Design a protein with these regions (language model features):
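Acidic, small-polar-rich N-terminal luminal/periplasmic segments of exported/outer-membrane proteins
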Residues: 23, 50-196, 587
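Outer-membrane beta-barrel translocator/receptor signature
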Residues: 161-163, 174-251, 259-263, 319, ...
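Acidic/polar loop-and-plug regions of large Gram-negative outer-membrane beta-barrel proteins
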Residues: 234-239, 247, 251-258, 262-328, ...
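Structural signature of Gram-negative outer-membrane beta-barrels, strongest in the C-terminal barrel
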Residues: 256-260, 379, 398-410, 417, ...
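Face-selective signature of the C-terminal outer-membrane beta-barrel domain
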Residues: 321, 326-342, 372-507
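Membrane-embedded beta-barrel scaffold of Gram-negative outer-membrane proteins
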Residues: 326-328, 332-340, 344-352, 576-661, ...
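Gram-negative outer-membrane beta-barrel transporters
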Residues: 489, 603-608, 626-715, 756-757, ...
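C-terminal beta-signal and adjacent terminal beta-strands/loops
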Residues: 704-712, 739-787
Length: 787
């Protein structure tokens, strides 16, 4: 397939000598204005000239961008993806920097919550709080990458230093390594370049004490050396949830040294401090009734006050250093070596809800009590990745070959805090250990019994550092090879294979007993497929891919088998089971229209995950059964992105999926749907350019109902009532923005998120005790200066 996209097939063509041209073509703060000639066959030169005129006044220099189409990325930032996205045989949704700005989203969790096919998971005492994502029904909290290298641990992730965010859907282990059953998330960060000079400052204020200031500056020091700095400070209260807030400090510094066309060195440092006092939201009572024909289902308690306690926190710190060397020994071949060292920490003490069940016999509710969720995690990791990328011909056949090796050492210490509750209890409730004193915030009629201020000082905890209860480490050596072969301009095949040899260690301490778990194994994964271009603008593909998940592969857990921690069958040893295995089939079509400015996509897919580890009991112990479960997800995904008209820009995606447990050690689970799984999701974003200086638009998001449960397991179910137990309702949300450029250097943007002030929940804890509450309406004003 060597036609109009020939220029981007070359490995690193947008990172090496060609990077300046690609960046210059994409420069504009009002790219839609340049896009007004997008469909004018005679206007191509005018677009380039127009953007070049304001090169020094802009910070939109993403080398992967589609010139003149700010919502559309032309290529992936992952060097293993050698084709343009319109000819990549997999569903990959890309969110550009301008999309994120106009959505008004800044944390990665909020960004991904708007992506169809992705849902958000909760933390609790079985798995850690932090960013948790579920892609096409499968856990992806360990499948997060930055510039193609794994970003381990449970932390808060920001977008202030990001060019674009890529969500790959479907098993990707030949690209990503272990995990990635449902897909992976890859953030492409901003890099220094000698090809341009700019400074951009954004300062925002808004309702609920919203303040946010960012700086993005790129300075060429010489013809061969450049520096780029991104700085962040942000603070906001959670809308209409007084007492809960979020604060961010960030810095990202990049240096690029390119003394010749055959050698380049890029060094990056990244830091983020995130300090939150989270609000865990409401709760949903368990259904009541006498049988399947007499069932009452309850909606979440909408009027729950903010019950966050004094001293509650969710704090994350991230520090990483990355070095990359690019060597082009001769035309068509590039050697890339990437090294990263990182340290992250994530600690939290949070307050949730418990109880509140309704008793139809007395027409009363059980008191709602407060619960504590706590833990901390210290992560240290090192990774080195070596790639050889070659473009060459064997006769009339063109190859894009990648050979690679990777070494990684991930170490995670999970621990707890020592907590003492000093506040006076005010009720007695029944639990597993019988009756015990407790902290109740409601009476039998669900009336809150504390005032707005005193409710935050009920428990009065003192917090001290505790002990480590899980010392987790995985050391991995990987080798891989993949090739994309163009036989003709209309026919190509692609394939790859990867081997990950790993050594696993996890020393778990539970109630004074220390248990070491160790084993080693090797994972083999691959992908293969075919692509056909019946028309120049249309690409039809079929793709097959596999993925593997290792026993105990989730780093935030010890011996909690039901949450991705280590599982041990009493009759076998830890290493006697196979890794969980997944395979995916995807049939898709992509049409890149209007001179590559408008992309339509459609895909049908099926993911089957087998050899699933299943827990015994409540999932908080290592006891379980090895390789007894299986589940399946089938679905359709449709997407569009680009310029519909010269003035109207859009991105939209729709997923329609179905999930089912097809085999289990527990026969009652067979036939049920997966937990935390939304059958239907939609997101659409529009931008209309009224004049060269004025634009407005908005976003609409829909997510169908979900049902809570343990990760990668059947949703919680009441067999007596024949109903799923805890339902997270479906919802629509709408956002809007308007922007104006006062001149070439100054502009302003207004964002209003959740315009209708919808009361909605993004996910729920498996027993319904708390539901993550979505933010209520917020309005912000951002002033931008470009120099």
């Amino acid at each position: 397939m060597r036609d109009r996209n020939r220029g981007v097939i070359r490995p690193l063509s947008l990172r090496g000598a060609g990077r300046g041209t690609a960046a210059a073509m994409g420069l504009s703060a009002a790219l839609i204005a340049g896009g007004a000639q997008a469909q004018d066959a005679n206007g191509e030169d005018e677009v380039v000239l127009d953007t070049l005129q304001i090169e020094d006044a802009t910070a939109d220099v993403n080398p992967n961008a589609q010139p003149g189409v700010p919502y559309k990325a032309r290529t992936s930032g992952d060097l293993h993806r050698v084709k343009p996205l319109s000819e990549t045989p997999q569903t990959i949704q890309v969110l550009t920097e301008q999309q994120l700005e106009e959505q008004g989203a800044t944390d990665l969790r909020d960004v991904l919550d708007n992506v169809p096919g992705v849902t958000i998971g909760t933390g609790e005492n079985g798995n850690a709080f932090g960013d948790r994502y579920i892609i096409r029904g499968h856990e992806a909290r360990s499948d997060v990458f930055v510039d193609g290298l794994r970003d381990p641990g449970m932390t808060t992730r920001e977008t202030f230093a990001v060019d674009q965010i890529e969500i790959t859907k479907g098993p990707s282990s030949s690209f990503a390594g272990r995990g990635s059953t449902g897909g992976a998330v890859n953030s492409i960060t901003k890099k220094a370049s000698t090809d341009y000079q700019f400074t951009r400052v954004d300062a925002g204020i808004g309702t609920d004490d919203y303040y946010r200031v960012t700086l993005d500056a790129n300075v060429p020091l010489t013809d061969t050396l450049a520096l780029r700095a991104n700085l962040l400070y942000g603070y906001e209260e959670v809308p209409n949830r007084n007492f809960s807030d979020r604060e961010r400090y960030g810095a990202a510094v990049s240096a690029a040294f390119k003394p010749s066309e055959v050698f380049e060195l890029v060094l990056d440092y990244y830091h983020l401090t995130a300090n939150d006092a989270p609000d865990l939201g409401g709760y949903v009572p368990r259904p009541t009734g006498t049988g399947p024909d007499d069932v009452t289902v309850y909606e979440p308690w909408d009027d729950v006050p903010n019950y966050t306690q004094n001293g509650d926190f969710l704090d994350s710190d991230v520090d990483t250093v990355t070095g990359r060397i690019y060597i082009t020994p001769f035309d068509g071949f590039t050697i890339v070596n990437s090294t990263r060292y990182g340290e992250t920490s994530n600690g939290y003490v949070l307050t949730g809800l418990r109880g509140g069940a309704y008793d139809p016999a007395t027409d009363t509710y059980a008191p709602v009590t407060l619960s504590t969720h706590q833990g901390n995690q210290e992560v240290e990791y090192f990774v080195n990745q070596f790639n050889v990328l070659g473009e060459f011909a064997t006769g009339a056949v063109l190859h894009n070959l990648i050979l690679g090796a990777e070494y990684s050492n991930l170490q995670v210490a999970n621990g707890t805090y020592d907590l003492t509750a000093n506040g006076a209890t005010n009720c007695v409730t029944a639990g597993r250990g019988g009756l015990s004193p407790n902290y109740c915030i409601t009476d039998e009629n669900r009336n809150v019994i504390f005032g707005e201020n005193e409710i935050h000082s009920i428990v009065q905890r003192t917090i001290a550092d505790g002990s480590v209860d899980s010392d987790w480490q995985v050391e991995t050596l990987s080798v891989y090879a993949m090739d994309t072969v163009d036989f003709t301009d209309w026919l190509s095949v692609h394939g790859g294979i990867r081997m990950d040899a790993f050594s696993y260690s996890n020393v778990v301490t539970s109630r004074g007993t220390v248990t070491p778990y160790t084993y080693s194994d090797a994972l083999w994964n691959g992908h293969a497929g075919i692509g056909v271009k019946p028309l120049e603008e249309v690409y039809v593909y079929f793709n097959y891919g596999t993925a593997k998940n290792i026993n105990g592969g989730e780093s935030d857990l010890g011996g909690n088998c039901g949450y991705g921690g280590i599982c041990v069958d009493d009759g076998t040893g830890i290493g006697d089971g196979s890794s969980e295995s997944s395979e995916s089939f995807e049939l898709g079509v992509k049409a890149d229209l209007f001179d590559d400015r408008f992309l339509l996509t459609a895909a049908a897919f099926q993911i089957t995950k087998g050899d699933v580890f299943e827990s015994a009991g409540d999932g908080y112990s290592a006891g379980g059964s090895l390789n007894t479960g299986e589940n399946r997800v089938r679905g359709l995904e449709f997407g569009l992105v680009g310029n519909i008209t010269p003035q109207l820009l859009a991105q939209a995606a729709l997923t329609v999926m179905d999930s089912e447990i097809t085999d289990s050690n527990d026969p009652d689970k067979i036939g049920r749907r997966l937990s935390n799984f939304a059958n239907t999701q939609f997101s659409g974003q529009l931008r209309y350019q009224v004049t060269d200086a004025i634009a407005f638009g908005g976003t609409a998001t829909y997510k169908s109902a979900q049902y809570t449960g343990q990760p990668d397991d059947a949703a919680s179910y009441d067999s007596n009532l024949d109903i799923f137990t805890y339902r997270v309702p479906d919802y629509w949300t709408f956002d809007a923005f308007a922007s104006v450029d006062f001149n070439q250097n100054f502009g302003a943007r207004v964002n209003v998120t959740n315009i209708g002030n919808e009361d909605y929940y993004v996910s729920g804890y498996r027993s319904g005790h708390f539901l993550y509450k979505g933010d209520e309406r917020r309005a912000t004003l951002t002033l931008t200066g470009k120099f």
